[in-house]
Amino acid sequence: MSEFRYAVNVLPKPGILDPQGRAVELSLPHLNVTSVSRVRVGRRAELTVTADSEAEARQVVEGLAKELLSNPLIEAYAIELLEATSSTDSTKATLA
């Protein structure tokens, strides 16, 4: 068995109202920041999954992202593999 550490990033889908992103965008001029636009605010979850393979671990994370961590009607998610650790030889590979 190996451990796989993932990040799931969730953002409002394009065209969906993003009041937090809008509030940040409206605050930028008060900070003299003029080079930033189209701000989107979301959330990030990090999970460690123990599985026989990366494909099996990703399937678990995909299910959680779709069913628990996001609302597929109004949010999009992206899954990123951060780290993989093999329990057989304690090899650690950081991917980020």
Model-derived features: positions:
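Long, contiguous binding/interaction regions
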Residues: M1-A96
